[in-house]
Amino acid sequence: MKYLNNVSYKDCVGKVCKSKSSGDFKVLKYNDARNVEIQFLKTGFETVTQLGNIRNGNVKDPYSPSVYGIGVLGNKHPITINGVLTREYKLWTSMLVRCYSDNFKKRQPTYEGCEVSDKFKSYEYFYEWCHKQVGFDNDGNGNPFHLDKDLLIKGNKIYSESTCVFIPSEINLLLTKSTASRGQHLIGVYWHNTNKAFVA
């Protein structure tokens, strides 16, 4: 059998090996065949794996861009709970799809040129940012607010912590459908800096 990395327990320590999808990694310590410590060279992430996985290159770095070649999952927060995708993960991947999926932009050309900020490319950062925002969980009646990038800055093309807010679905629908001329925000709506909320 041909291995991606031809190493044995006798000579693996110190070797730089290749993974199938996360770049090169170095073997730091061999404890036994099921407990081998490694470190990915690009990100510095350390983990424990099996010797067989090292030979086959079947090890993954959660800090290597893996979602649309740009999103970094990290290792701190779940993407599913009891087999169900988390709201944070669905929001994050939906944002990446809108900006980096060619197929999506063919169907929705208004998203052409949209980007995600460097911080929002990290699921860990986005997850924690969401939990600090008013309206992330719900509007008080159990209805989730929508993530929006257009209300604070007219014509905005960047999803970031300084341009995104959670807004009621009704306002989001008006923003989507309205073609009327307006100011910086929706007609009759302004952002109250002190209260960190929208006022109509």
List where the protein language model places each region:
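Short, cationic Gly/His-enriched loop motifs
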Residues: 38, 77-101, 106-197
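Short amphipathic alpha-helical linker/capping segments at the junctions of internal repeats
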Residues: 54-62
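Short cysteine/histidine-rich zinc-coordinating motifs and their immediately flanking basic loops
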Residues: 53-55, 179-180
